[in-house]
Amino acid sequence: MKIGYARVSTGLQNLNLQEDRLNAYGSEKIFSDHISGSKSKRPGLDKAIEFARSGDTIVVWRLDRLGRNMEDLITLVNELNERGVSFHSLEENITMDKSTSTGQLLFHLFAAFAEFERNLILERSSAGRIAARARGRYGGRPEKLNQKDLNLLKTLYDNGTPIKTIAEQWQVSRTTIYRYLNKLEEKEDEKQGEVSN
């Protein structure tokens, strides 16, 4: 059985073109989603997969209707294969049926591209972090308290002000105050170590 799946990203788009192509190809049942491909929950696709039985084929108008990226597509094709379901894209004229040697070749090519895409993303992310560090930027949230606040915090603490009161003054948790105090203590230890050398 051929099971169609159609997806549009916005409410401004409609499914008519995709559904017409899926019907012309002989899809007996069509499931659809009006949702961005970047969303992980696609109820129409989930229903299509659940409906499909071994020997069925899920048909899409274009590959990008099925997966957000190559990795998602590979994961989905694997899931379909485990169920004995093949996959066909009309626009690209690609059939992925891992029971055939051509289907296996295509699957491995797609898997290689998915890994390549993952590695490119990792390389770009790493290069971005290195470039940011070179400009003096580091990841994570900015510190809540500046050096002036830290000096006042230390003075209040040294004068016996309760941690709870200090935390309320800066609207942070007591754990955060303890963390700042530990950092200040470490800095003082480092300075004393430098002086004694």
Swiss-Prot record:
GO biological process: DNA integration
Active-site residue numbers: S9
Keywords, in A-Z order: DNA integration, DNA recombination, DNA-binding, Plasmid, Transposable element
Cited CDD domains: HTH_Hin_like (cd00569), SR_ResInv (cd03768)
The entry's DNA-binding region: 163-182
Superkingdom of origin organism: Bacteria
Start and end residues of each Resolvase/invertase-type recombinase catalytic domain: 1-136
GO terms assigned for molecular function: DNA binding; DNA strand exchange activity
Purpose: Resolvase catalyzes the resolution (a site-specific recombination) of the cointegrated replicon to yield the final transposition products.
Family, as annotated: Belongs to the site-specific recombinase resolvase family.
Protein name (Swiss-Prot/TrEMBL): Transposon Tn552 resolvase
Gene encoding the protein: tnpR
